[in-house]
């Protein structure tokens, strides 16, 4: 039996009323059934007639029949107590919409939903709107007044603008020994010191007592005076250049020592200080310099690389530099030619054996020949050498003309023969120097204008021969006018010796060939002959 009905007092009352009505209906049915049975028993079928009594089914209109099962209504168990719960919040059961088949054969006692919810309620969170409280304007105004009064009357943090500590400035390095900022004098510092410790003038007593035995102001004054007296050489030698170069043979000359002749080379600087390189940059025990193996200029004396310098060539270099007064390596050629007008006349025979390699080496540092200055120096050397040659020829002619009437010395036949032999040797040397110089000038970076260089070499050779012949003719005429008539000058043809093969020993991209310096080292050439160059097309 389905017993899911609500057991409340009102429900029980309604149920009781329904049960009483049901019992009344049953009693009526039973009474009607009994009366019908009695009438049926009195009317037998033997008499052959049917009696129509008032209790017959045709005549009875108040017969109560049970409703059919298809019209059975399913009642909601909450409908009975719905009216009693209208004033309460609606809390639906979690199993309200769960499909459940009733246990028809169940005879155990079960609590209904209302009783279960009261005995064992579930935790259901209420809605958020139930906890929203509306603010009270009176209480809010009171709290704001109290907060503003607290921050106005009491100072929590003082303002940093009116802080008195900002007016006090900390002065560093206020000792009397330091120079003011306006004085821009250079401060002397020792290069060997890596860390400088600066202490305030007033020290704590314990620290002052601890440092007192280590401070010696009298020695510090001597050292400072010695450092002030030491000039540029000490600073130059103690700089980083010691680590980069081997400066054992480098002498730094002051501003007053510029007139002192140097041994190897003098390089002028804009500051007026000159640096003299004595010998090579690095004279090691093995005799090989650090830069000599890379440069085609082995040495400045025209000797083989292994020959030591015994001082024979230093005198020629000193005299030549003293007479020429060579300026900076990239000086204009006009200034040098003007100085050479007065200096070339006084050069003796012993000074005329400097090769072209010496002249070139005196103009730039002994570095690699493929330096960026190499091309410009080559052209400047050509123009300078050409003008030196012309000036020498002109000056020789002038000297012969001026001294033609006054006999300076007497010549003998033996001296004339020696002069002719010297002229022949000078012609041979001129030819070799011309060939070597043209070989060095033809070894350019690109083989452009090869034919033009060959034609220029031929013209140069012919002009040098003609100039030499004119010079010899003038000399013989001047000597004949002063002493006695001499024989007509015989043309000395250059003797063709063993042909020396000229080949390039480099890769073809160096500006100066090694064969050029081979000639200059083996044969002592004349200065005037070595200065022969192409005609004045590039001047």
Curated annotation (Swiss-Prot):
One of its GO terms (cellular component) is nucleus. Residues 408-428 have a biased composition (Acidic residues). Keywords: Cell cycle, Cell division, Cytoplasm, Mitosis, Nucleus, Phosphoprotein. The modification Phosphoserine is found at residue 383. InterPro entries: Aurora_borealis_protein (IPR023252). The keyword Secreted does not apply. Phosphorylated by aur. Residues 32-43, 433-444 have a biased composition (Low complexity). One of its GO terms (molecular function) is protein kinase binding. It holds the Pfam family BORA_N. Residues 23-70, 398-499 are annotated as: Disordered. Residues 44-63, 458-467 have a biased composition (Polar residues). One of its GO terms (biological process) is activation of protein kinase activity. Belongs to the BORA family. Required for the activation of Aurora-A (aur) at the onset of mitosis. Interacts with aur. This is Protein aurora borealis. It comes from Drosophila melanogaster. The lineage of its organism: Eukaryota, Metazoa, Ecdysozoa, Arthropoda, Hexapoda. The gene is bora.
